[in-house]
Regions:
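Short beta-strand-centered aromatic/proline hotspots
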Residues: 21-30
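Mixed-charge, Lys/Arg-rich low-complexity intrinsically disordered regions
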Residues: 1-9
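Intrinsically disordered, low-complexity, charged/polar segments
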Residues: 40-56
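Short, solvent-exposed secondary-structure boundary/capping segments
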Residues: 33-40
Length: 56
């Protein structure tokens, strides 16, 4: 299932294109443009990465 970056919520399990695996979103910053993943890595969601996959 694909969703827009603006629909990402804390606690969602999302796919990181950079790391190639799923992580839990722990924090959302800058009006949804930057998210913190459960491994502590920041993921920028910009025009090149406008959608993320969530695990069902």
């Amino acid at each position: 299932m694909r969703i827009k970056a603006s629909e990402v919520k804390v606690g969602m399990r999302v796919w990181s294109k950079t790391l190639g695996e799923y992580f839990i979103v722990t924090e959302i910053r800058n009006n949804g443009e930057e998210i913190t993943l459960s491994d502590g890595i920041f993921s920028m969601i910009g025009s090149t990465d406008a959608v993320v996959r969530i695990k069902q």
